[in-house]
């Protein structure tokens, strides 16, 4: 069965691995105290420890990683900007992105905490082809400040 077969579903998978920090940076982007060149992380309490939950590129380049205790992160990078995790706000942001994706297909499903599935069966030709649709969606999300990984499969 070919990829264009009417019986084969085509799914565009979107993964937003840095949704928590991207959401915060988008919120702060218009303020005068924008983060600039300061490494930033989102932390969450797990088993009586405060751990990095999400981080930006600057924090990665500074040697930080998801799961690292905040105390260790501050020792590595004293100028670190820290935000508390907010799962409700992250979920609302994912819901908002899903609503935005309705412009590409009426069949959008959440894959929490940071993913979406778009059933693009029969829709891709409206945007050129599957490759063009993938580039349009991922490019538009990147332009809006989100780190995104995307793939299409059956």
What are these model-derived regions, one by one?
Residues 1-117, 131-139, 143, 148-152:
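Residues that scaffold, gate, or flank divalent-cation-dependent active/transport sites
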Residues 123-127:
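Short, charged/polar, Gly/Pro-enriched secondary-structure boundary elements
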